[in-house]
Amino acid sequence: MKVNKEEYRGDYGEISLQPESLDDLWHLKYIVEPGDTVFAMTFRAVDSVSDKIRPDKVEKKLVRLGIKVESTEFHKFSNRLRIKGTIISDLDAGAYHTLNIEPYSELSIAKHWKSDQIERIRDAVEASKRPEVEIVTIEEGEAAIGYLRQYGIEEVSRIRQASSGKREGADARSVDGRGEFFGEVAAQLKYADKVQTIVVAGPGFIKDDFVKFLRVNHPAVAQKVIVEDTSSIGSSGFQEVLRRGAIQRVAEENRITREAQLIEALLSEIAKDGKATYGFAETKRAVDYGAVETLLIADETLRGLREKGARDIESLMRDVEHARGKVVVFSTEFEPGQRLEKLGGVASILRFPIGGD
């Protein structure tokens, strides 16, 4: 994310941004909300003399347009954020229009800013400077490759070894015996030239043999590899990599690693009826006691409450910050955020237990 300009009067201000990736569009989904004013370049139909002669032909020109936001939609697979609202100026004021924001589009957002939204922009700017990571989880005959994004791990490829011509014994366990399979896996490392780190993980010794294969056949890629033990591959293997801290060793401030560790700490405290709360009412009680060390909120829960105009959540976050606690907004596109949402979307890790009523 790139910030081009910021202007504030109190908590109201306008920020000019340039998203640079799919991750940045995902962040904007939770920054732009109903009632905001957004300006961006867009195509609009314009009247001309030729239109009157040939009414079936509509000319469109690129113009800068401002809309009052009603809704947003994040389209991961088409690489865009759609912002729908009513035009605030021009001859078509009041008409509906949708702004399609893509990577490297520029937009300006004018609104009453909340502290977590400003922090989210700062995080996105910092995240663009961090190393990106590709993860290979591999076992006998099968591998899954994932790309670490700020909103979670996206599985980009799965490779299965052909069942025909299977080898047995020592030959099956040799690097040569797996050469074709390893070659297919290496060919699917689509981001190898882009990322700074590749985590190779899985059960047994096959991951080590795959790294040996890379050293011989793809030495530049092998230089980026770190190896991690996991008991499985695919989604559960990706989560093991995160829990074991492999990603944290690469980028200690990575959002996903932090959320995975926080949710584990929360669930551990809940299991022993210790220093934790979940659900809005119980968490608010802990905030009133000044007991909250870290407030955990699912992004979809926060977004939904704000769209309904609920102010309790804003005061809850503000009270935690005033008491020198931390507020962490979780991504619900990633497993820890989904688990938090199942607990009501709001929870806390406490400085001290508060007990029951």
Swiss-Prot record:
InterPro entries the record matches: eFR1_2_sf, eRF1_1_Pelota, eRF1_2, eRF1_3, Pelota/DOM34_N, Pelota_arc, Ribosomal_eL30-like_sf, Transl-rel_pelota
Its EC number(s): 3.1.-.-
Cofactor(s) essential for the protein: a divalent metal cation
Coiled coil: none
Single GO biological process annotation from the record: nuclear-transcribed mRNA catabolic process, non-stop decay
Pfam families found in the cross-reference section: eRF1_1, eRF1_2, eRF1_3
GO cellular component: cytoplasm
Top enzyme class: hydrolase
Domain of life: Archaea
Keywords: Cytoplasm, Endonuclease, Hydrolase, Metal-binding, Nuclease
Transmembrane segments: none
Subcellular location: Cytoplasm
Example of a GO MF term: metal ion binding
Reported function: May function in recognizing stalled ribosomes, interact with stem-loop structures in stalled mRNA molecules, and effect endonucleolytic cleavage of the mRNA. May play a role in the release non-functional ribosomes and degradation of damaged mRNAs. Has endoribonuclease activity.
Summary of subunit composition and partner proteins: Monomer.
Family (UniProt): Belongs to the eukaryotic release factor 1 family. Pelota subfamily.
Record note on domains: The N-terminal domain has the RNA-binding Sm fold. It harbors the endoribonuclease activity.
Protein name (record): Protein pelota homolog
Species of provenance: Methanocella arvoryzae (strain DSM 22066 / NBRC 105507 / MRE50)
